[in-house]
Design a protein with these regions (language model features):
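Basic, alpha-helical nucleic-acid-binding regions used in initiation and control of genome expression
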Residues: 1-206
């Protein structure tokens, strides 16, 4: 988060920024960066010492390791949504609950809901011809469907932030009324029932 880095007396990277679910900063209500705004290099704070040679300048985590751009001065983009603020609000609540849980605080997180969300996102990443869930939900919320190059299976953790954000928004749209919307997707032949349930050790009652 550029705003977090700008406000730090000593800039540091939060562990929560590494969680695939977290695509935005709840405090500053802006999207997280995963690439340098200036040179498009991946943001990798652990590379900050690379290539310094005999330079006396102390490296800072707020600078791009490749071009030294000040990441704290990057544009702050508001989280986008396509259908209504409700999907974004649901997604933000999950991020808030997971963060509270990781800090040992009281949390309202339902792990069964996160299990379903992850399964739905995995199905939207599928490239099988029998699975149209990605296109189906994108059409429902008025978003452009993400196209996946090649045939290699991709995990959400390896996706660019903008793709993770859109997929999680699409999953959040389904989770706002899961019984109704997932059933409708199945009836529209956007997903097969056996694909929907195959990765669950214990399915939610609903």
């Amino acid at each position: 988060c550029p705003a977090c880095l700008a406000s730090d007396a000593i800039p540091y990277f939060r562990k929560s920024w590494r969680v695939a679910l977290k695509t935005m900063c709840l405090q500053h209500e802006c999207l997280l960066l995963d690439r340098c705004e200036q040179c498009a290099a991946p943001i990798s704070f652990h590379r900050i010492d690379m290539g310094r040679g005999g330079l006396e300048i102390e490296p800072s985590m707020r600078h791009c390791y490749a071009c030294k751009f000040d990441l704290a001065s990057a544009r702050q983009e508001a989280p986008e949504f396509h259908d209504s603020p409700a999907s974004l609000a649901w997604m933000m609540e999950q991020v808030r609950s997971v963060y509270a849980l990781s800090e040992g605080l009281s949390s309202s997180v339902y792990l069964s809901e996160l299990d379903v969300l992850r399964n739905l996102v995995g199905l939207m990443l599928s490239r099988t011809s029998a699975n149209r869930l990605n296109e189906y939900v994108a059409e429902k919320i008025g978003a452009p469907a993400i196209e996946w190059p090649g045939n290699k299976r991709t995990a959400i953790e390896s996706l660019p932030r903008w793709q993770r954000h859109q997929l999680l928004l699409q999953g959040s749209w389904l989770m706002l009324a899961p019984a109704e919307r997932i059933t409708a997707a199945w009836q529209a032949k956007a997903i097969r029932y056996n694909h929907l349930i195959k990765d669950f050790e214990q399915m939610p009652d609903w």
